Amino acid sequence: MKEIFFAKNDLSNLEYSLNREVLRANVSNAYSCTTLPFCNTRKYHGLLIVPQPKIDNQNHVLLSSLDETINQNNNSFHLALHRYQNGVYSPKGHKYLESYELGLLPTHTYRIGSIVLLKQMFFQEKQDRLLIKYTLKEA
């Protein structure tokens, strides 16, 4: 099976990457839907969306996004990307994205100076649970 791969040029180009959505789901109907750089641009975007039969039988966004920060030598590097009114984006974490590979375990690779960080997100098969794994590959 050929894996889908996006390089830094694709990910740092917001006109391109914000128009590419990633959808992952499991058998319990939980799902994650967002753009390549994790910037939610639509109402239905989120990292963990789960049907709530005890409330109203509708899907609810339980986890919208994460605002991860890497601290190195008294400097903070924010990995998130949010879109605000008038086309303002902040913080600009997409500039640290090195690659995205969609395989069995989707992997975002971030590079901040000499640090290389892998971020993998996957669902437990039959539970409404999203697992996020970070691996420090180089430092």
Stretches found by the model and what they are:
Residues 1-139:
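Terminal accessory carbohydrate-recognition/targeting modules of carbohydrate-active enzymes
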